[in-house]
Amino acid sequence: MAEKFDHLEEHLEKFVENIRQLGIIVSDFQPSSQAGLNQKLNFIVTGLQDIDKCRQQLHDITVPLEVFEYIDQGRNPQLYTKECLERALAKNEQVKGKIDTMKKFKSLLIQGLSKVFPEDMAKYRSIRGEDHLPS
């Protein structure tokens, strides 16, 4: 899988370098540099074709739009992953707290019902396969 990304990264680096060189040629254009300009334009077209060929290998990869927003804002896209993990951890802790509360409530409810309806709760525990009161 990383091989696909390495291949794309290589093509993107070449493309960016050709764009940089094209910018240098264009910023100080002389009629004598027309051949070099044409060559760079051809390299850019070829580079775009190479990048497009990589697309077929990566068609199943999706990138959240928020990552592009981070990049547009000049932020590190890895911060997006970090913040997603932090949100997931916080949500996980919140859900764990709810689960623990529900387990405690169930235990207290069964204890209370066992005191008020001991025979019915004995039947309930036998149906559930529980031999004892939960603590």
From Swiss-Prot:
Record keyword Ligase present: no
Disulfide feature: none
Principal localisation: nucleus
Protein's job: Component of the Mediator complex, a coactivator involved in the regulated transcription of nearly all RNA polymerase II-dependent genes. Mediator functions as a bridge to convey information from gene-specific regulatory proteins to the basal RNA polymerase II transcription machinery. Mediator is recruited to promoters by direct interactions with regulatory proteins and serves as a scaffold for the assembly of a functional preinitiation complex with RNA polymerase II and the general transcription factors.
Keywords: Activator, Nucleus, Transcription, Transcription regulation
Similarity comment text for this entry: Belongs to the Mediator complex subunit 10 family.
UniProt GO MF annotations: transcription coregulator activity
Subunit composition and interactions: Component of the Mediator complex, which is composed of MED1, MED4, MED6, MED7, MED8, MED9, MED10, MED11, MED12, MED13, MED13L, MED14, MED15, MED16, MED17, MED18, MED19, MED20, MED21, MED22, MED23, MED24, MED25, MED26, MED27, MED29, MED30, MED31, CCNC, CDK8 and CDC2L6/CDK11. The MED12, MED13, CCNC and CDK8 subunits form a distinct module termed the CDK8 module. Mediator containing the CDK8 module is less active than Mediator lacking this module in supporting transcriptional activation.
Record organism: Macaca fascicularis
GO biological process assignments: regulation of transcription by RNA polymerase II
Cellular component, GO annotation: mediator complex
Protein name: Mediator of RNA polymerase II transcription subunit 10
Gene that this sequence comes from: MED10
Domain of life from the UniProt record: Eukaryota
Family annotation (Pfam families): Med10 (PF09748)
